[in-house]
Amino acid sequence: MSYLFTSESVSEGHPDKVADQISDALLDQFLAYDSHARTAIESFVTTGQVVIMGEVRSEVYIDLQTIARKTINKIGYTKADYQFDGNSCGILTAIHEQSEDINRGVDRQDEDEQGAGDQGMMFGYATNETDNYMPVSLDLAHLIMRTLADIRKEGKVMTYLRPDAKSQVTVEYSDDGHPQRIVTIVVSTQHDDFDADENRMLAKIKDDVKNILMPRVKAQLGEKELKLFKGEIDYKVNPTGKFVIGGPHGDTGLTGRKIIVDTYGGKGAHGGGAFSGKDSSKVDRSAAYAARYVAKNMVAAGVADEMLVQVSYAIGVAEPINIYVNTYGKSHVNMTDGEIAKVVGEMFDLRPKAIERMLKLRQPMYFETAAYGHMGRKNEVVEKTFTSHYHPTKTMQVELFTWEKLDRVDEIRRVFGL
């Protein structure tokens, strides 16, 4: 019997994502001027107020307030009407130095033996149901949100849009786990109060979502995803009606509260650790990226149609405690999942410092991850410029989403005889 599966995404203007982007913008600023910086930065946003908290170990001083304000304005919170804007919000900072007890457990004379920054288990997942090896429900939900933000920033149509928005996509799967069609698309978007007649205002937004937003979304899809737009799709647009009050004024935002949006939309598994604001010594982040890198390359190589990879650590210990693989019965090699996991451990060095080197995680590459998902994104090199009241302006080439590279596929095929 067929079944339905749902994933959601949120816009860069969602309050939790505002907090994530502030945390990662600050991380990037530290890394731009001190590639060895260690950070664990949490941000909190509410009506007219930002609180920045956490632990940092760095040789440089960063103007936290300036970076936070620039980030908020870049997202689109620039008007006093929003009750939260980058120019006028209050900003309270409470940053202190990282615990020496943690430093002693992580630092080693031989940096290859750098210990994990914490205990925990991390997961990576990949499926061949889309070209970027992501669940189709999440991939489409992200694309809807990115496209809506593009329309808002262009300011040519749907000029009533405000930054906060959410999407949700439900997909029907066949008995054997293949996506068949899109069943429901939910879009909730914040908007100006542009018509005294609420029914007419809602009708306009619904019409624009169907006739402006969705055609632009479809124009960006590959053949696999376009085939799913068949039959009657139930569009639910702003189901509560009016959505004028939103963003941090409507709901308090906090770093790390959208961990399923950030990863696989409910597919696979999640170890519970958030990403934003954390440098790569924190395996919550770096090992989750490495596990995605392993899973994606393994699926792309044809080892399985779908794969979940778990890796776990003890604080202060470099070697992983375990590596686990689940191919969901979709393996194409004559090996058990346990045997596949053993080969993964032999092929991939998953010690924290090795992961940093393998994925080039000491670059200021994190702001771009903080909205629209950390996984399934485009690996590319971009030029980024960092300015500071305390340091010279710095322009550098930064490689983004290194864990999305498919540079181990040929090696994996040789090892597995594919």
Where do the protein language model's features map onto the residues?
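N-terminal, positively charged regions that mediate nucleic acid binding
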Residues: 1-40, 155, 409, 415
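Glycine-rich, mobile lid/loop segments that gate access to catalytic sites or pores
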Residues: 6, 66, 73-245, 371, ...
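Conserved phosphate/anionic-ligand binding catalytic regions in large, soluble enzymes, centered on
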Residues: 8-10, 14-19, 115-130, 244-269, ...
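Alpha-helical support elements that line or immediately flank enzyme active sites
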Residues: 12-31, 129-148, 278-302
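A short glycine-rich, hydrophobically flanked beta-strand micro-motif that places a catalytic Asp/Glu
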Residues: 37-41, 165-171, 233-237, 303-314
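Short, charge-patterned binding micro-sites
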Residues: 40-58, 315-319
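Internal helix-turn-beta structural module
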Residues: 46, 306, 313-418
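Glycine-rich anion/phosphate-binding loop at the beta-strand->alpha-helix junction
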Residues: 196-300
